[in-house]
Amino acid sequence: KMKEGGLPYNYSELADELLAVSHRPYGTGFYYGDARQSPDVDGYTAECRHAATVEACEPAGEGAFRVIARCYNRFCEGDELEALSPGPHIPLVRVRNLAWLPAPDGDDAQPKRVPVAVANRSAERYAFETGEELAPGDFLRMRINVER
């Protein structure tokens, strides 16, 4: 298979992505006696957590970009997030100047951004600055420690 530009895919680069998917540990199920799906681990295994999805990105000065993203799992000021994008490979993205963007309501039609240290409101919008240009739809994730 070829990717854009006629270059062959390097499948070894994609191999780690298979391990990053959240799933229950594999087991023998009913094959050997009582059914046990995951005797050693309770719950799912994952090496990455979906932190946010990019909704917009615009220039914010020389070498800086302002990102608007919808939060799915907690991330913090200073965290380094991995960006998964159908476009060019993007290195780690460091979160700077994190702010919560409250939704308008009956009391405040144009609420001001609120500087925060932690993005912890699931499905809410946040803004931050970074040195990398992102695109709407880019998936931001963070690596987590998983014992196996």
Where are these regions (language model features)?
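Surface-exposed amphipathic alpha-helical tracts and adjacent flexible/coil segments at the periphery
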Residues: 1-148
